[in-house]
Amino acid sequence: MEPLTAYPLRCSGPKAKAFAVLLSMVLCTVMLFLLQLKFLKPKINSFYTFEVKDANGRVVSLEKFKGKVALVVNVASDCQLTDRNYLALQELHKEFGPFHFSVLAFPCNQFGESEPRPSKEVVSFARNNFGVTFPIFHKIKILGSEAEPAFRFLVDSSKKEPRWNFWKYLVNPEGQVVKTWRPEEPIEVIRPEIAALIRQMIIKKKEDL
C-alpha cells in the first residue's frame, strides 16, 4: 500500500480561488465599515445631549438646561450626610437660581443602601424635610454596567467616580464638567466656583449681543 502522500491533494482550483478572493473582499469591506463607525461616529461631548427619567418615570431631555450652569449630585435620604448636603444644595439653588443655575439631583441606592425609597417618595422627603425646590430625577445606578449614561458621562469626563453619596459635578453652559467635589467639602468652597462660572457666562452673553 502506497503512502497517502504519494497522491497529491487537490485542494485548490479556479472556483476555490475565486471564493477566497470574494471572501477576502467581503472581510475587507466589513472591516472598513467597522472602522468608519468607530471614527465617524459623533462623540458625545455634552451632558445636555442625554435623556433621563424624571421622578414619575417619564423620559425628559436635559437639553432644557443647556445654556445654564448646573451642579449635578447623587443624593440619598438615609445617609449621615443627607441633612447638611440637602440644606446646602437648596441654599445654592435659591441663591443662584435666578442667574441661570440649577441643582440637578439623582437619587442612588448603591452606597450603603441609603436610598431605599421609590423616586416619588424621595422627592416628597426632600421637599417636606428640607424645602427642596430643585429637580430630583428618577433613581439611577452610577456604578457598574447598568450605570445611567448621563451620569457615566460626568464620571468619564472628570475621571472622578463617586465613592459615596453627594458627590458634586459642576457643569458649564455647554455641558462639560469643569469641577468636582467630594461630599464632605463645605458649601463655602463650592459657592465661589459657581459664582465665577455664572459670571463668565453672563459676560459671554453680553459679548455675543
Curated annotation (Swiss-Prot):
It catalyses: 2 glutathione + H2O2 = glutathione disulfide + 2 H2O. GO terms for biological process: response to oxidative stress. Pfam families: GSHPx (PF00255). InterPro entries: Glut_perox_Gpx7, Glutathione_peroxidase, GPX_CS, Thioredoxin-like_sf. Keywords: Acetylation, Membrane, Oxidoreductase, Peroxidase, Transmembrane, Transmembrane helix. One of its GO terms (molecular function) is peroxidase activity. The active site is at C79. It comes from the Eukaryota. GO terms for cellular component: membrane. It is a single-pass membrane protein. The chain crosses the membrane at residues 18-40. The modification N-acetylmethionine is found at M1. The keyword Transferase does not apply. It is found in: Membrane. Its EC number is 1.11.1.9. The keyword Phosphoprotein does not apply. SUPFAM superfamilies: Thioredoxin-like. Belongs to the glutathione peroxidase family. This is Probable glutathione peroxidase 8.
